[in-house]
Amino acid sequence: MEINGTVIEDTFSEAFTGRCVRATITARDMETVRRAAYDSTATPGAVIGRVEGGVESFHSADETPDGRPGATVQFYYALPDLEKFQVELSYRIRQDILVKPFTALYNSTPDPEGYMDMMKHVGHCGDGYEWIEEFGGREMINIPIAVPDFKIESKMGYRDAIMGANFWYMCRDPETVLEAGRAAINAIGEVEGVVTPFDICSAASKPETNYPWIGPTTNHPYCPSLRDLLGDKSKVPEGVGYIPEIVINGLSLEALEEAMRAGIETVCRYDGVLMVSAGNYDGKLGDHRIDLHGVL
C-alpha cells in the first residue's frame, strides 16, 4: 500500500491493556494550566514500571467544572497493582500540579470501573488541616497551602484503557522528522480520548537486552548509524536516515485506530517520509493488534 508515494508496510502495532485516570486541571490562567499539564505528564514511564501520561486537550473557561481555563490529562499504569498506581499518581499530582498557584484537579474519567481515594496520598499533604467541601455536586478535598488553596476531587475514577499503539515514519532528512511529526501530533490531538506520551520519540526500544538492569534498550536493527556495522542484519531501508516513532495511548481501541489513521495520513503528506511501519513483538506480548492497512 502507498499513500502519496509513501510505502505503508503490511504490519501491525502491538498494544497493551493498562489502567487510566483521566482528570481535568484548572487554574487562574492558561500559562499555569499548561505548565501543570505538561510537567505532570512529562516523563513516559510505563516501560520502567512507573506512571506515564499525556495532555489530551486544553479548554476555555466555559468548558471546565469551575469556570476557569483548563486541560484534560490522562495518566496510565501498565501493572495491575492499584495501590502502586495511586502512589505513583500522587507524585505527579503533588509535585507538578499542587505546587502550581491556584490549581485544582477534577475527575473526568468516563465510565469508570472504580475510584481512587485521593485523601491518603494527596489530601493528607494538608497535615490534618485539610477538609472536605462540596462544589458543583462534587466532593472536594481542600488542602491549605501558602498560596490558598489546592482543591482536588476526593475520588478519581480509573478504567481499563490501551497503551503503546505506535507507528514509525521513516524519513530522508532531519527537517521531515520534526515537521511531519509535529503535524501528526497536532492531528492526533484532534481525536478525543487519546494522548501521545512521548511526543516525537527518537528512541524505539526492544525487550531483549544485554543489560537487564537497564530495561528495554535500543532497537539496534533500526538504528541508521549502525547500518554499516550490522550489514545484512540492519533493517533500515535504503535512503532512510531517521526512524522516529509516535506512541499513542487511548481510552478505547476505536479512538486509537482513529488516531493512528490521522497520524499516518498526516505524515504521508511530506515528501521526506519514505515509509511507515510499526513496532510489535510478533503478537506475543500485546493484548491488541492494530493493522496499519486495516486502519487506513
Swiss-Prot record:
Keywords: Transferase. One of its GO terms (molecular function) is formylmethanofuran-tetrahydromethanopterin N-formyltransferase activity. InterPro entries: ForMFR_H4MPT_ForTrfase (IPR014053), ForMFR_H4MPT_ForTrfase_C (IPR002770), ForMFR_H4MPT_ForTrfase_fd-like (IPR023447), ForMFR_H4MPT_ForTrfase_N (IPR022667). One of its GO terms (biological process) is one-carbon metabolic process. It comes from the Archaea. It holds the Pfam family FTR. The keyword Methyltransferase does not apply. The keyword Membrane does not apply. Transmembrane segments: none annotated. Belongs to the FTR family. This is Formylmethanofuran--tetrahydromethanopterin formyltransferase-like protein. The gene is ehaS.
